[in-house]
Structure formats: C-alpha cells, structure tokens
Amino acid sequence: MKKIISMFSLVLIGLGNVQGQGMKKEAMMPDVSSWPEASKMAVKEITDKYGKPDGVTANELIWMNKGVWKKICITKMETKHSFPIEHTDMMQTTIMYKVPEDKMDELGVFDGSVTFDRTQGTMSARCDMEGNNFLALNLAHDIITGKKTVDEARKAYGDIVKEKMNGGNPEYMQKLTFATQENTMDPDKNTTGLTKADVMNGGKGK
C-alpha cells in the first residue's frame, strides 16, 4: 500500500512540475495587446519567422543571433519617419559591420534611421518591417562601397518601395546582398595619456 501511495505521490509531483514549467513558459510569452498596431504587426512578423524573443520587457522585445541579424529589437514606442514615405519606425535590426570613418557622414545624410556603433562594430536599420531594413542596409552598403552616391541611394530607395507596392519582389528587400563581417569592433586609441590610476586619483597623478 505504501508503495502504491509513493508511486501516486511521484506522479502528482511529476504533474506539478510539468504544470509549473508550462506556467513559467506561458509567463514568458510577450503580451503586446496594448501596443500600437504597427508594433504588433512587427512582433508577429518576427515571431512567425524566428520564434519567441530572447528578451522581454514591458516596452521592447529582443531576439539575438537570428538569421543574418546580430540583434533584433522591436519597441512599443514608435518614431515618426517621413522617408521614403510617411510611416513609423519600431523594428531595429543590427549586423556586424565596420563602417569606414570617411563614410559615416554620408550614412547620416542617406537615412537617419540607419545608424552605426563604431566601438561595437555594428550597423543597424530601424523601420517597420524586416524587408525595409534589408533595403536600407543594402543601400547603405552601396554607399559605403561607392556603388551609389547618397542621392542615388535615396532615389533607389523610393523606386524599390514603389516596385514592392506595385506587386514586385525586389531582391534588395528579400535579403542582405552582401556578407556580414567579423572582427569589426574598434576600441579606439588612448590619445589623452590618462591611465586608470590617474582617473582613480582624480587626475592628480601618483
């Protein structure tokens, strides 16, 4: 009898663990029901393609190392953006890419939603759909490699979006047309002469 009771207890414990795991898993599922419609659509697009996010807060979802992306971040907050047409930005996708110093200003003129982090060695695009981020980064690469001027890239952006809206399937919106890079981080150089010891001593030296 004791043996039967013990077995029954183990079954109950096992069921409790499974239910507990299920509840924990369900708790990790993001609730975006109160988010703006465009942000919810972005979440659905990325979740359908890459699965559940790796990080969840009340205002943003994060996926790490999915497809070609080092990071994908979708935010509840949307930012108005008028280029190439009126829309809002909320989906940022990031790749490993070393932007040459002499091209940094040109990228800023091309599209304010294409950004880079020289220290981390990344380049990002922030728009409303993955395809638009592919497009922005592909055109940014064209500028960096000298294939297009800033004006040519901005015109191409509009032309390609029109093609897509008219039922086309432009390559620049399907994937990155170039390979992402490695070893792109740039720690910069110490040109101040200061050391950690100097900082700890308030710059007074030893």
Task: Name each model feature, range by range.
Residues 2-7:
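Sec-dependent signal peptide recognition
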Residues 9-11, 62:
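Amphipathic, positively biased hydrophobic alpha-helical segments used for protein targeting
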Residues 27-71, 75-206:
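Non-cytosolic coordination micro-motifs
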Residues 11-18:
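Hydrophobic h-region of N-terminal signal peptides that target proteins for export
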